Amino acid sequence: MDKRLWVGVVSIFPEMFRAISDYGITSRAVKQGLLTLTCWNPRDYTEDRHQTVDDRPFGGGPGMVMKIKPLEGALADARQAAGGRKAKVIYLSPQGRQLTQAGVRELAEEEALILIAGRYEGIDERFIEEHVDEEWSIGDYVLSGGELPAMVLVDAVTRLLPGALGHADSAEEDSFTDGLLDCPHYTRPEVYADKRVPEVLLSGNHEHIRRWRLQQALGRTWERRADLLDSRSLSGEEQKLLAEYIRQRDDS
């Protein structure tokens, strides 16, 4: 049976998610039936004419906090729509586990996700304690809400669904998939502004091309994200290729 993913999103700005439902790889996955993406707006679960979803924080301080009841109403309908699927509830939060490719692979194993996109100063902690299974962050910086992180997560996970990408090997060759940054890529023309495409890529020798790409990925990772190499065990071939890359760089 083909792997499919059901995603429900709780957000006061559901229109933002048209950026992934209507465009790109995620849109194609929706059309192919690989991805189901549905949004619920907490404002639809309020009882006042202003559709208020936030209130002042107890203890004072700046900003507002999202209220529990509208979030619970939206979450209840999302759970119901998930049907018999076991849906993991995720809150996009700066306090959460940082999203890496390894984490993306974990999430891609789920059959259903419900993403809570907060706003303002955050959401009432009691909602998190009662309903949230995991908190995830996309980085140590401040955004205006959880919508963009939620879209990042959906895009990253969708890429791992079999059939979502145009080429079966595309996801495996992405940066971080094997713990390394990606190698450089080139297309026509062969010469641009006196810069030539590396000869090995024109050689037609698949083994030489594979080794060159691996060496470039290792070298680029060593130069730009050496921390990734600290948590990755290099094979004998990789150690040799990296040492050769560093030697060539020092000699140039």
UniProtKB/Swiss-Prot annotation:
Functional note: Specifically methylates guanosine-37 in various tRNAs.
Naturally occurring in which organism (per UniProt): Pseudomonas aeruginosa (strain ATCC 15692 / DSM 22644 / CIP 104116 / JCM 14847 / LMG 12228 / 1C / PRS 101 / PAO1)
Binding site for S-adenosyl-L-methionine: G118, I138, G139, D140, Y141, V142, L143
Protein name: tRNA (guanine-N(1)-)-methyltransferase
GO cellular-component term (any): cytosol
Keyword flag Hydrolase: no
InterPro entries on file: Alpha/beta_knot_MTases (IPR029028), tRNA_m1G_MeTrfase_C_sf (IPR023148), tRNA_m1G_MeTrfase_TrmD (IPR002649), tRNA_m1G_MTases_N (IPR029026), tRNA_MeTrfase_TRMD/TRM10 (IPR016009)
Keyword terms, alphabetized: Cytoplasm, Methyltransferase, S-adenosyl-L-methionine, Transferase, tRNA processing
Keyword Methyltransferase: yes
A biological process term (GO) from this entry: tRNA N1-guanine methylation
